[in-house]
């Protein structure tokens, strides 16, 4: 299950994972299936968008349906009938997103279950056990994600705690893993402070993770700040290891990050935006709720080969959205994910052909 960099165009990389015969080419975008499903789609529909690896959330699955239920099926893959690889998030981001429901201690985090109000204690060790029981192909260490604009002292304290939890995650993963083919990724923290990011990465490299993620981004910083940080930290990540930018993002974010050497992405944006009627097309975004689409008989995007664009008009999609029909969310999601996966396919081809700069230029020119 080794990662290989196959070709490179400046900093942009075309790579490959082999998960038991499932070949995953990078740069890759992973749709978010928090609860073991990409909202509104069945497995065949997910596959037909070109998606080959998905992300699920270990903490949310631990709360519902529960670790034991998934173990009855043998793995999360069996539970949801998905035969591709799965990456699971550890629950660290929920320290940020569910901050009103948790209290952080050095040993772990006391969460208040948002479903039934009961308290539970999540530790690095428990997070590893949950993810191992899920059968995750890529397991994320348990970390503390904080807001980007915290002061230096608070950011340093959180970064050091994440390093401590990373060591504990590494030890417990090595002790409990059932399969040598599971991968464990470390997460680089340090907020907006390059010196703290440097320390975080240096210590994580000593722990020899299978890949390295950049955490604590897409949480309020500007694009320029994110790009500046990527320019600084990405070249320091071991070249033979995959680089994962968590929670990012818009199509232009993916392109700018690939340009800076990132290999892996996940984000709720294409699926969440689809449910809100924001659809990505070659020349920008269509807000299908706009009344001007009521009598528009054209397809969403003439260049798109997705099921939605091959079968339905903008007028029909506008109608479904105005009636709040479930089918509307489904067709929109199919389109947005297909758009993202086609974008990644074209990015990979451009890197292979050493034409990534030309691809980037054409991408932005189409948006004008």
UniProtKB/Swiss-Prot annotation:
Described function: Catalyzes the base-exchange of a guanine (G) residue with the queuine precursor 7-aminomethyl-7-deazaguanine (PreQ1) at position 34 (anticodon wobble position) in tRNAs with GU(N) anticodons (tRNA-Asp, -Asn, -His and -Tyr). Catalysis occurs through a double-displacement mechanism. The nucleophile active site attacks the C1' of nucleotide 34 to detach the guanine base from the RNA, forming a covalent enzyme-RNA intermediate. The proton acceptor active site deprotonates the incoming PreQ1, allowing a nucleophilic attack on the C1' of the ribose to form the product.
Species per Swiss-Prot/TrEMBL record: Buchnera aphidicola subsp. Schizaphis graminum (strain Sg)
Amino acids binding substrate: 89-93, 143, 216
Family, similarity comment: Belongs to the queuine tRNA-ribosyltransferase family.
Keywords: Glycosyltransferase, Metal-binding, Queuosine biosynthesis, Transferase, tRNA processing, Zinc
Protein name: Queuine tRNA-ribosyltransferase
Binding, Zn(2+): 304, 306, 309, 335
Cofactor binding, per record: Binds 1 zinc ion per subunit.
Keyword field contains Transferase: yes
Name of the gene this protein is made from: tgt
EC numbers: 2.4.2.29
């Amino acid at each position: 299950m080794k990662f290989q960099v196959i070709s490179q165009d400046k900093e942009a990389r075309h790579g490959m994972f082999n998960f038991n015969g499932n070949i995953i080419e990078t740069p890759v975008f992973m749709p978010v299936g928090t609860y073991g499903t990409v909202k509104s789609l069945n497995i065949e529909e997910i596959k037909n968008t070109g998606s080959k690896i998905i992300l699920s959330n270990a903490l949310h699955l631990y709360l519902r349906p529960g670790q034991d239920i998934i173990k009855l099926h043998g793995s999360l893959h069996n539970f949801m009938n998905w035969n591709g690889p799965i990456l699971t998030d550890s629950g660290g981001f929920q320290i940020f997103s569910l901050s009103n429901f948790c209290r952080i201690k050095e040993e772990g985090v006391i969460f208040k279950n948002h479903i039934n109000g009961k308290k539970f204690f999540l530790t690095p060790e428990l997070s590893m056990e949950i993810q191992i029981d899920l059968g995750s192909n890529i397991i994320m260490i348990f970390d503390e994600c904080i807001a980007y604009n915290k002061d230096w002292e608070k950011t340093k304290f959180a970064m050091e705690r994440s390093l401590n939890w990373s060591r504990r995650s590494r030890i417990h993963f090595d002790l409990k893993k059932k399969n040598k083919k599971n991968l464990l990724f470390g997460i680089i923290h340090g907020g907006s402070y390059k010196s703290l990011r440097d320390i975080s990465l240096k210590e994580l490299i000593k722990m020899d993770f299978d890949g390295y993620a950049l955490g604590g981004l897409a949480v309020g910083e500007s694009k320029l700040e994110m790009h500046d940080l990527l320019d600084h930290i990405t070249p320091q990540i071991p070249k033979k290891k995959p680089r994962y930018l968590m929670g990012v993002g818009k199509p232009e974010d993916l392109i700018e990050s690939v340009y800076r050497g990132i290999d892996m992405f996940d984000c709720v944006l294409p699926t969440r935006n689809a449910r809100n009627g924001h659809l990505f097309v070659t020349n920008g975004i269509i807000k299908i709720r706009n009344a001007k689409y009521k009598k528009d008989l054209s397809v969403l995007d003439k260049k798109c080969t997705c099921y939605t664009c091959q079968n339905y008009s903008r007028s029909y999609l506008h109608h479904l959205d105005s009636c709040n029909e479930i089918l509307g969310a489904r067709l929109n999601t199919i389109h947005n994910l297909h758009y993202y996966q086609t974008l990644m396919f074209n990015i990979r081809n451009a890197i292979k052909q050493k034409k990534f700069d030309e691809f980037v230029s054409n991408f932005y020119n189409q948006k004008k």
